[in-house]
Each structure stands twice: as C-alpha cells, then as structure tokens.
Amino acid sequence: MISTNDFKTGQTIKFNNNLFQIVSFLHVKPGKGAAFVRCKLKNLRTGSIIDNTFNSGIKVELAFINKNKIQFLYIDGNKYIFINIANYEQIEIEKQKIKNKIKYLYEGIIVDVVIYNDYEILDINLPEKLNLTVTKTEFIEKKDVKTNYYKDATLETGLVIKVPLFIQQGEKIIVNTQTGLYVSRCNK
C-alpha cells in the first residue's frame, strides 16, 4: 500500500480492479477544506487515460510490473511471436494488445515487454528512436519544390511518413516512435 502523498510519476497502482500508471499528479491544498491529489492515470490494459481525484493521505495498492527484453521473430495470424532474450522462452502477443506499435516492428528488433504478475502481458515499449530503411519514395521535380518541402516515404516496416525532399530510396533514417515523425538521416 502507498499513500497518495507519496505518489510518483511512473508508479503503477491498482485502483477500481484495474492497473493504472501515474502519468501526472498535483497535490492541491485549498484554503478551506481537506487537501487532495489530482491525478492523470493511464489504464495499462486499455491504454485509455482518465483524470481522478484522491483524498490526501488515503492508501492505494501498489502494483508491481516487470519489464523484460524480448526480440521480435515473426507473425502467425493475429499473434506476434517474440523470444525472451534472458531465457529463450517464446512469447505470443495478440495483435490487439500492441496494435499501435505494429508499424514499427521488424524482424530482430529488441523491445521491452511489460508483464504483471509474471503472466499477464500488458504492452510492449519500443525504443524512442529507430533506424529504418526507406523502401519507396515519391519523385518530386525541382519545379515543385516551392510548394512541397516534404514527401511521402514508405519504410521497411510498411509505415508511411513525411520526409524531406533530399531523402532517397535505400537510405536509412531515424524515426521517433512516440510521434511517428522523421528525425534525421542515419549516419551508420
């Protein structure tokens, strides 16, 4: 159990029979009345974010989650197959659990898996930035440069993003997985 006075960003709590990660919190001490803690909580099972207010000093159950390094192997229907790097155990994750991260997965990528109670897989965490190869890009003529500063590029994972005009097919670029935006050329 943890007091609401001891909340920290990133902690995981059990509340209303669900697992929530504390995204942000604010201790409020009004001039009149009892103090309270206003929180923004992310449901780890659904991904939704809620706002909640706790009375100051009440106890909430702390949930312990594990993170393990896993490597993506292949797709089998609606299941994505990974291997745990530590013990070489094969892990199957349903497509719906990682639906918004599928567009960044390629064979061999290493990600963190978030597990509750050693059996319930909640999510995967991608690296903040990935080096990906451009497999297809539009050709833009020089006369169109005044209007188009970015063009579409298809990456090796199938993801389509906007890139600067100088990026060509076959080049490696860095993509931010949080925003889905082009960062820079890859120097490697």
Curated annotation (Swiss-Prot):
GO CC annotations, alphabetized: cytoplasm
SMART domains, per the entry: EFP (SM01185), Elong-fact-P_C (SM00841)
InterPro entries: Elong-fact-P_C, NA-bd_OB-fold, Rib_uL2_dom2, Transl_elong_fac_P/YeiP, Transl_elong_KOW-like, Transl_elong_P/YeiP_cen, Transl_elong_P/YeiP_CS, Transl_elongation_fac_P
Entry keyword Protein biosynthesis: yes
The UniProt record lists the keyword Transport: no
Biological process annotations from GO: peptide biosynthetic process
Molecular function terms, GO-annotated: translation elongation factor activity
Pathway field: Protein biosynthesis; polypeptide chain elongation
Entry keyword set: Cytoplasm, Elongation factor, Protein biosynthesis
Subcellular localization: Cytoplasm
Pfam families reported for this sequence: EFP, EFP_N, Elong-fact-P_C
Function: Involved in peptide bond synthesis. Stimulates efficient translation and peptide-bond synthesis on native or reconstituted 70S ribosomes in vitro. Probably functions indirectly by altering the affinity of the ribosome for aminoacyl-tRNA, thus increasing their reactivity as acceptors for peptidyl transferase.
Family from the record: Belongs to the elongation factor P family.
NCBIfam families, per the entry: efp (TIGR00038), PRK00529.1 (NF001810)
Protein name, as recorded: Elongation factor P
Organismal lineage: Bacteria, Bacillati, Mycoplasmatota, Mollicutes, Acholeplasmatales
Gene name of the encoded protein: efp
